[in-house]
Regions:
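Short charge-dense sequence patches
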Residues: 1-2, 13-17, 117-126
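Membrane-water interface segments at the C-terminal ends of transmembrane alpha-helices
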Residues: 2-107, 131-150
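Short helix-to-coil transition segments within interhelical loops
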Residues: 109-136
Length: 150
């Protein structure tokens, strides 16, 4: 009995941690890109991202199930009912939350540094690095919020 409980706890923590880290790794550069670039549909994109933060876990699970079932586009991977499918579902749930929170934070912070980045001629990856190192505690907190949703 003890071994099965610890196994379930281990898998749950493993899946949640990996999906949270993966979501953050994808969300941070994407959110910096969204905040830095000026394009016509920016406000609509941010509104859609904010709306996706309330996606019910059942819907995310259904989307994941349809994607990884035998007849789905990822059916060839044969990962249905595995931790990998759980990671995909949690990624679908967590990604909009982390993306939305980082965008909201960067919209406040980036204008303070924009002229400085421009004067130094900072490239995109340098901006990513500086923004991440400048407010790492905030981004750690955002990661914890995403983990809590997982």
């Amino acid at each position: 009995m003890q071994e099965s409980i610890f196994s379930a706890i281990y898998i749950s923590l493993y899946v949640s941690i990996i999906s949270t880290l993966t979501s953050f790794v994808f969300s941070f550069p994407l959110s910096v890109f969204i905040v830095i670039k000026k394009f016509k549909l920016k406000s609509i994109l941010i509104t859609v991202i904010n709306a996706l933060t309330s996606i019910p876990p059942v819907c995310a699970g259904l989307i994941c199930y349809l994607a990884v079932s035998r007849s789905g586009p990822l059916g060839w991977m044969e990962i249905l009912y595995t931790p990998y499918a759980m990671m995909i579902a949690q990624f679908i749930i967590i990604m909009p939350i982390i993306l939305s929170l980082i965008i909201r934070n960067l919209e406040e912070e980036y204008p303070l540094f924009e002229e400085e980045f421009r004067s130094y001629g900072a490239k995109y990856f340098q901006i990513l690095k500086l923004l991440l190192l400048n407010k790492y505690k905030v981004y750690f907190t955002i990661g914890i919020i995403g983990f809590g949703r997982a």
